[in-house]
Design a protein with these regions (language model features):
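Alpha-helix C-terminal capping/helix-to-coil transition sites in glycosyltransferase folds
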Residues: 22-23, 49
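Short, well-ordered beta-strand core segments
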Residues: 7, 27, 52-53
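Conserved SAM-binding strand-loop segment of SAM-dependent methyltransferases
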Residues: 3-19
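Structural alpha-helical scaffold elements that stabilize or flank donor/cofactor-binding regions
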Residues: 19-20, 46
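S-adenosyl-L-methionine-dependent methyltransferase catalytic module, highlighting the catalytic core
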Residues: 40-45, 52-139
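Structured catalytic core of nucleotide-sugar glycosyltransferases
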Residues: 14, 23-26, 42
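Active-site micro-motifs of SAM-dependent methyltransferase domains
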Residues: 14, 34, 62
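A short SAM/SAH-binding and catalytic strip from SAM-dependent methyltransferases
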Residues: 25-39, 57
Length: 139
């Protein structure tokens, strides 16, 4: 703890049962969700222990991913996705729109969504142009 900020680092797939309801003001899942096995259960637990959460995820709907897969016929490799299909930690490949729909179907409120391309926020064609999405969510 420094300056009133508590940070906990743990195996998130091991469960968050050590923490009570609303134990944290904010839980951050940075580039994590796509690498977990039980996505829905994890999001439920994160929103149980946190009053809100920030989730960042890569956009597998980005035009370059579509191009590499559609034209090149291979799973994409890039600076943001530097792994081959056989050694990637990612087990879920989703788009920004997929996460929007997931939240709507599960009764999760998206308080704010920012879509980034080249480090800048964009609004035009976010599911095609966005490289990364940042969602602030709550129940």
């Amino acid at each position: 703890q420094q300056r009133g900020l508590n940070i906990v680092q743990a195996d998130i797939e091991g469960g968050l049962n050590l923490f009570g309801d609303a134990a944290f003001d904010l839980v951050i899942l940075s580039q994590t969700l796509q690498a977990t096995r039980h996505t829905e259960a994890l999001v439920n637990e994160v929103l149980r222990v946190g009053k809100s959460a920030i989730v960042t995820l890569p956009n597998f709907g980005h035009w370059s991913v579509r191009w590499q897969l559609g034209v090149g016929g291979r799973m994409p490799v890039s600076k943001r996705l530097p792994y081959q299909w056989y050694d990637t930690p990612n087990v879920h490949f989703s788009t920004i729109r997929d996460f929007d729909v997931f939240c709507a179907e599960k009764g999760i409120t998206v308080e704010r969504r920012a879509v980034l391309a080249g480090g800048r926020e964009i609004s035009l064609l976010p599911n095609v142009r966005g490289e990364t999405a940042v969602f602030q969510i709550r129940r």
